[in-house]
């Protein structure tokens, strides 16, 4: 579960390395985000020459969480880190590569471009 002030790794090559959650989108009093949910975040660490700079406010979608997600068949999927991919308003990633695995729930949430760029879908 990702909440306000949570720091996440960035799993793409948009130029950001780490982001800090500002707000979870989707409802007035929503506190937590899971895999496939969109957040508003601030870039805390960035690589030189990247598309996004430190201090930029961006939208990102959660692709991996330590808490994990429960599948309809009763199984759970958990990851070693909390990670997100920076996206544009039309749900396409700002980077051209995705690093690390992403959850199958991304396909159901409608992020086909992220799923197709990912090296592994679990």
UniProtKB/Swiss-Prot annotation:
One of its GO terms (cellular component) is cytosolic large ribosomal subunit. GO terms for molecular function: large ribosomal subunit rRNA binding; structural constituent of ribosome. GO terms for biological process: translation. SUPFAM superfamilies: Ribosomal protein L14. PROSITE patterns: RIBOSOMAL_L14. It comes from the Bacteria. Binds to 23S rRNA. Forms part of two intersubunit bridges in the 70S ribosome. HAMAP family: Ribosomal_uL14 (MF_01367). Belongs to the universal ribosomal protein uL14 family. This is Large ribosomal subunit protein uL14. It comes from Streptococcus uberis (strain ATCC BAA-854 / 0140J).
